[in-house]
């Protein structure tokens, strides 16, 4: 194992949520009498939710609230990327620690419970903690100081994850798929 501590992003890294988030966004656009293609919305959401709202519904003050409500319905049945749970478990079995930082509120805790991966995290940081949003490194520096992290890897699917991790002095991995990540962190998953 190349690192002792792993700081994870949730959406798009452990949780395969961009499809459901995109569907909720397109549905919300339709509710507001607006249209955009699935692919356009998907690309915009990969930048950020705020960016997507500015692109497709900039003059609708209630849009974000309606989208978040639709997205919450979609996320009632969260789906992990294949191998995510096993990788988290193996890190723990090999003496490592997992941490999670998300921009979402305490809905994250429900998602972790539904996907049964909450037990793999030493600490989960959500919007409720009140830290500045990534790419600001404040939440990562909090974990670094509290847990005295020396050998840490930040894993996320967006440039803001990498920027925050680098600013906090961590190594970073821009997530593309679970198999490549397993090879990068040099963990042998136990096969049943």
Segments predicted by a language model, with ranges:
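Conserved phosphate-coupling serine/threonine residues in phosphotransfer and NTP-handling enzymes
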Residues: 13, 101-102
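Conserved short hydrophobic patches within well-ordered secondary structure
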Residues: 18, 22, 101, 111-112, ...
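Residue-level signal for short amphipathic helical patches enriched in basic/charged
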Residues: 44, 48, 103, 150
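N-terminal helical cap/lid subdomain that shapes the substrate entry/recognition surface
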Residues: 2-82, 86, 94
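Asp-based, Mg2+/Mn2+-dependent phosphohydrolase catalytic module
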Residues: 1-4, 37, 89-92, 105, ...
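Short, flexible loop segments at the rims of nucleotide/cofactor-binding pockets, characterized by
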Residues: 74-79, 102-103, 130-132
